[in-house]
């Protein structure tokens, strides 16, 4: 259950340490930021920003990669219900190819913060790169296993992206997007070799660019970024 007194408080309390440090420094509305989809060969990079009520514990919330799909889906709903604000930003395949994956990730993170229904006073960011915004912030290596806010953002980003890839699987059959979500699985690489890249493949990525025709005839139309506020 959620609340201030979980059955096993050690892990959730540890995950509030970074938020507690920011609160003691006088910052409020602390947003955790994380992304999903930096490594895949296809599809967008998705970032999420989550502001939780101070002191809220969410037992079970951890790095999304350590959770089952069923658990992520369950916690996705819990986070939306308990959070003060949730924002999502999307950098599509075309943006990734145009400005590189790091810059597309930072752009998606910035969009996620802008999509929040309230302005955060402090950002806790998974990774080592600051977001180009005039908001006090701190980067945290492996932050999705150290901060409840970042872990919550990790789950929102992962579930959002996975759902998008399931939709792409129906739109572009034969690649198996619903199963591997665009990552470089052997079955995915084999499909690219057989079918060639489809419109959502990242054409600057190894594993894809080797199979491009000399004059690509792929439609990269569509918005490069997206803002979604919950």
UniProtKB/Swiss-Prot annotation:
Family of the protein in this entry: Belongs to the RNase HII family.
UniProt source species: Geobacter sp. (strain M21)
Gene3D superfamilies: Ribonuclease H-like superfamily/Ribonuclease H
Keywords linked to the UniProt accession: Cytoplasm, Endonuclease, Hydrolase, Manganese, Metal-binding, Nuclease
InterPro entries tied to this protein: RNase_HII (IPR022898), RNase_HII/HIII (IPR001352), RNase_HII/HIII_dom (IPR024567), RNaseH-like_sf (IPR012337), RNaseH_sf (IPR036397)
Function description: Endonuclease that specifically degrades the RNA of RNA-DNA hybrids.
Residues noted as binding a divalent metal cation in the record, renumbered to the chain: 34-35, 126
Catalytic class of the enzyme: hydrolase
Domain annotation RNase H type-2: ranges: 28-217
Keyword presence, DNA-binding: no
Stated name of the protein: Ribonuclease HII
MF terms (GO), sorted A to Z: manganese ion binding; RNA binding; RNA-DNA hybrid ribonuclease activity
Cofactor names: Mn(2+); Mg(2+)
Cofactor remark from the record: Manganese or magnesium. Binds 1 divalent metal ion per monomer in the absence of substrate. May bind a second metal ion after substrate binding.
Reactions catalysed: Endonucleolytic cleavage to 5'-phosphomonoester
SUPFAM superfamilies reported for this sequence: Ribonuclease H-like (SSF53098)
Cellular compartment(s): Cytoplasm
The EC number(s) this enzyme carries: 3.1.26.4
Any one Gene Ontology cellular component term annotated for this protein: ribonuclease H2 complex
Disulfide bonds: none
One GO process term, biological-process aspect: mismatch repair
Region (Disordered) location: 211-230
């Amino acid at each position: 259950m959620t609340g201030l007194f979980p059955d096993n408080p050690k892990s959730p309390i540890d995950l509030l340490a970074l938020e507690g440090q920011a609160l003691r420094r006088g910052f409020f509305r602390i947003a955790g930021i994380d992304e999903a989809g930096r490594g895949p060969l296809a599809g967008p990079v998705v970032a999420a920003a989550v502001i939780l009520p101070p002191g809220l514990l969410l037992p079970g919330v951890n790095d999304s990669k350590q959770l089952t799909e069923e658990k992520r889906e369950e916690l996705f709903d819990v986070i939306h219900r308990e959070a003060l604000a949730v924002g999502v930003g999307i950098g599509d395949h075309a943006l990734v190819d145009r400005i590189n994956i790091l810059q597309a990730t930072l752009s998606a993170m910035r969009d996620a913060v802008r999509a929040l229904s309230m302005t955060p006073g402090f950002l806790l960011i998974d990774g080592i790169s600051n977001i180009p915004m005039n908001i006090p912030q701190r980067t945290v290596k492996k932050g999705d296993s150290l901060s409840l806010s970042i872990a919550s953002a990790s789950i929102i980003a992962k579930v959002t992206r996975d759902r998008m890839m399931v939709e792409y699987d129906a739109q572009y059959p034969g690649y198996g997007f619903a199963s591997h979500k665009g990552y470089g699985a052997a079955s995915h690489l084999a499909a690219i070799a057989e079918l060639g890249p489809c419109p959502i493949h990242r054409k600057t990525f190894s594993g894809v660019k080797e199979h491009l025709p000399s004059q690509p005839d792929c439609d990269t139309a569509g918005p490069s970024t997206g803002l979604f506020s919950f």
